[in-house]
């Protein structure tokens, strides 16, 4: 929803409205992400049981999910920044940020999982820290451009602005949510069959996610 709302404002030459959209997006999603992260960290044990994690993988799964849940604000911050870039007509910069994050992620995975032998926790640390890198890169670029100036008042919640963002964004979120729920159900069924089946399904889901990149970018 943010990308569309910013695009409309920029297209109309209304930088003040674009600033309000950006400020309200930051307020809405960053506060929401912190609350969500705290809730999920508190529920990590029930979640691990809910998805029927094989006994031998419980400890690793718990560590992995805990670190990933703590990193939710980083994921949210990057997505907010990426939507701002795209709303201003720049789809290349987010691609560069993600490319850099992927390189960092691979390097950190080798370090944490290979050198330090941290296992699943190391993989989660690599992912979370690489996401933080993408956020820092995006922030540096967007602060240098100064194409849209923000004031403190832009971060004050405005009902009309948030309604516009959510009215466009919620249907898209619901669409993605349905897909993720179906994958979650498949994961639960695979976990119930044992560690080998769970690993196989995990690999296939990664491949499917890669194949979906092209149609999802249309």
Annotate each predicted stretch with a short phrase.
Residues 2, 43-44, 81, 108-109, ...:
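Hydrophobic/aromatic residues in alpha-helical transmembrane segments
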Residues 105-110, 134-139, 210-213:
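Hydrophobic transmembrane alpha-helices of multi-pass small-molecule transporters
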Residues 6-11, 18, 47, 70, ...:
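Hydrophobic/aromatic residues within transmembrane alpha-helices of membrane transport systems
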Residues 27-31, 35, 70, 96-103, ...:
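Hydrophobic residues within alpha-helical transmembrane segments
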Residues 67-86, 94-102, 123-136, 216:
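Short runs within selected transmembrane alpha-helices of multi-pass transporters and secretion channels
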Residues 6-73, 115-170:
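Short alpha-helical transmembrane segments in multi-pass integral membrane proteins
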Residues 1-4, 68-75, 163-218:
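Transmembrane helix-bundle signature of multi-pass secondary active exporters and lipid flippases
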Residues 1-38, 75-94, 201-218:
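Small-residue-rich hydrophobic transmembrane alpha-helices
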């Amino acid at each position: 929803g943010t990308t569309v709302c910013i695009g409309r404002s920029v297209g109309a030459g209304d930088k003040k409205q674009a600033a309000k959209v950006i400020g309200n997006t930051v307020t809405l999603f960053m506060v929401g992400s912190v609350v969500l992260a705290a809730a999920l960290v508190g529920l990590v044990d029930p979640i691990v049981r809910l998805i029927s994690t094989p006994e031998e993988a419980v400890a690793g799964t718990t560590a992995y999910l805990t670190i990933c849940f703590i990193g939710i604000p980083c994921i949210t911050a990057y997505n907010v920044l990426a939507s701002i870039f795209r709303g201003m007509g720049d789809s290349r910069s987010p691609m560069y940020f993600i490319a850099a994050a992927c390189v960092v992620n691979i390097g950190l995975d080798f370090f944490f999982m290979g050198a330090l032998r941290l296992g699943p926790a190391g993989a989660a640390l690599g992912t979370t820290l690489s996401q933080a890198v993408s956020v820092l890169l995006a922030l540096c670029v967007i602060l240098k451009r100064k194409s849209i100036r923000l004031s403190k008042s832009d971060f004050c919640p405005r009902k009309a602005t948030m309604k516009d963002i959510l009215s466009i964004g919620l249907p898209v979120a619901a669409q993605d949510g349905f897909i993720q729920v179906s994958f979650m159900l498949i994961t639960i069924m695979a976990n119930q069959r044992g560690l080998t089946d769970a690993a196989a399904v995990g690999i296939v889901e990664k491949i499917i996610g890669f194949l979906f990149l092209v149609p999802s970018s249309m």
